[in-house]
């Protein structure tokens, strides 16, 4: 599933290509993925709208349109949003293409999704910034208002284990399985530790490592195992730099011990039992 670094990479790759362009029409081939404001049709509501800015909130991509509305795109497990310039639009269409946006410069924006879990939702800009999905979102880990003091105060109030806490989007927006495992590994913290058991120094390590691993993921253009590519169809490179995720049975990059892969609440968790306490 695309996490914060992947969605931010998609945003950056598309911003210079489609900002300022107008949506001439939309072909929607899988209606169940698209939602519009009450009383409007998705395709009609987008026709003639200009894309004025691309943003992101957590794992949600935000296409801000004129008229103070926003198209919220949640890629979920296997969603892809790829832009094709006019000279590229004759390229064969990928299987599972569920929506095509025709832009006024002759280019196309194609949304594909093998698993069909992703959604395209048109809402007011204010609503998109406040709550783009069903649940309330926590702070942005790379945001200027995400301070260590606030993070530490939030930790001491939680008896939740660290791994599920980092996956809780109401606690922090944007982390998923990959970057939660990586942050805990770098911070040398066991995923089963409870948040309230961390002392100040451990909390600071976790705070710093969350921000570091997310920024490194962005710098590497995301993590590509199977489905993820950016808005130009390019794979990321962070999979080559992972410490624990996807490396079960391999030696720890820090101590040489064996990386374990275990199930936690139905999710795979990767960690080094020697380093992470």
Swiss-Prot record:
MF terms in GO: 8-oxo-7,8-dihydroguanine DNA N-glycosylase activity; class I DNA-(apurinic or apyrimidinic site) endonuclease activity; damaged DNA binding; zinc ion binding
FPG-type zinc finger span = 243-277
Coiled-coil intervals, chain numbering? none
What domain of life is recorded for the organism? Bacteria
The record ties this protein, via SMART domains, to: Fapy_DNA_glyco, H2TH
Cofactor entry: Zn(2+)
Which terms does the UniProt entry file under GO BP? base-excision repair
Annotated catalytic residues: 2 (schiff-base intermediate with dna), 3 (proton donor), 59 (proton donor), 267 (proton donor)
Q: Which reaction does it catalyse?
A: Hydrolysis of DNA containing ring-opened 7-methylguanine residues, releasing 2,6-diamino-4-hydroxy-5-(N-methyl)formamidopyrimidine; 2'-deoxyribonucleotide-(2'-deoxyribose 5'-phosphate)-2'-deoxyribonucleotide-DNA = a 3'-end 2'-deoxyribonucleotide-(2,3-dehydro-2,3-deoxyribose 5'-phosphate)-DNA + a 5'-end 5'-phospho-2'-deoxyribonucleoside-DNA + H(+)
Q: EC number(s)?
A: 3.2.2.23, 4.2.99.18
Q: How is the cofactor bound?
A: Binds 1 zinc ion per subunit.
UniProt xrefs under PROSITE patterns: FPG_CAT (PS51068), ZF_FPG_1 (PS01242), ZF_FPG_2 (PS51066)
Where DNA is bound, by residue? 96, 115, 158
Q: Could you tell me the keywords of this UniProt record?
A: DNA damage, DNA repair, DNA-binding, Glycosidase, Hydrolase, Lyase, Metal-binding, Multifunctional enzyme, Zinc, Zinc-finger
Which InterPro entries is this protein grouped with? DNA_glyclase/AP_lyase_DNA-bd, DNA_glyclase_Znf_dom_DNA_BS, Formamido-pyr_DNA_Glyclase, FPG_cat, MutM-like_N-ter, Ribosomal_uS13-like_H2TH, Znf_DNA_glyclase/AP_lyase, Znf_FPG/IleRS
Which family is annotated? Belongs to the FPG family.
Which HAMAP family does the UniProt record give? Answer: Fapy_DNA_glycosyl
Q: How does it assemble?
A: Monomer.
Q: What does this protein do?
A: Involved in base excision repair of DNA damaged by oxidation or by mutagenic agents. Acts as a DNA glycosylase that recognizes and removes damaged bases. Has a preference for oxidized purines, such as 7,8-dihydro-8-oxoguanine (8-oxoG). Has AP (apurinic/apyrimidinic) lyase activity and introduces nicks in the DNA strand. Cleaves the DNA backbone by beta-delta elimination to generate a single-strand break at the site of the removed base with both 3'- and 5'-phosphates.
UniProt protein name: Formamidopyrimidine-DNA glycosylase
Q: Which organism is it from?
A: Heliobacterium modesticaldum (strain ATCC 51547 / Ice1)
Q: What is the lineage of its organism?
A: Bacteria, Bacillati, Bacillota, Clostridia, Eubacteriales
């Amino acid at each position: 599933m695309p996490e914060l670094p992947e969605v931010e990479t998609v945003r950056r790759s598309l911003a210079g290509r489609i900002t300022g362009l107008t949506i001439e029409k939309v072909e929607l081939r899988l209606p169940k993925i698209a939602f519009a404001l009450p009383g409007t049709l998705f395709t009609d509501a987008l026709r003639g709208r200009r894309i004025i800015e691309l943003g992101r909130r957590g794992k949600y991509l935000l296409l801000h349109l004129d008229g103070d509305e926003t198209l919220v795109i949640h890629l979920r497990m296997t969603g892809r949003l790829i832009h094709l310039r006019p000279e590229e639009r004759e390229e064969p269409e990928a299987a599972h293409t569920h929506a095509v946006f025709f832009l006024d410069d002759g280019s196309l924006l194609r949304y594909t999704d093998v698993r069909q879990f992703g959604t395209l939702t048109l809402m007011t800009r204010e609503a998109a910034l406040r709550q783009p999905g069903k649940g309330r979102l926590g702070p942005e880990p790379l945001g200027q208002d995400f301070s260590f003091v606030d993070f530490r105060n939030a930790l001491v109030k939680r008896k939740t284990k660290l791994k599920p806490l980092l996956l809780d989007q109401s606690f922090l927006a944007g982390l998923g399985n990959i970057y939660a495992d990586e942050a805990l590994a770098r911070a040398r913290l066991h995923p089963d530790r409870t948040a309230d058991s961390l002392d100040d120094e451990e909390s600071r390590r976790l705070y710093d490592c969350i921000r570091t691993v997310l920024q490194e993921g962005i710098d590497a253009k995301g993590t590509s195992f199977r489905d993820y590519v950016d808005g130009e169809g390019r794979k990321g490179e962070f999979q080559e730099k992972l410490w624990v995720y996807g490396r079960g049975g391999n030696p720890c990059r820090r101590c040489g011990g064996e990386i374990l892969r275990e199930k936690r609440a139905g999710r795979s968790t990767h960690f080094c039992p020697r380093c992470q306490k």
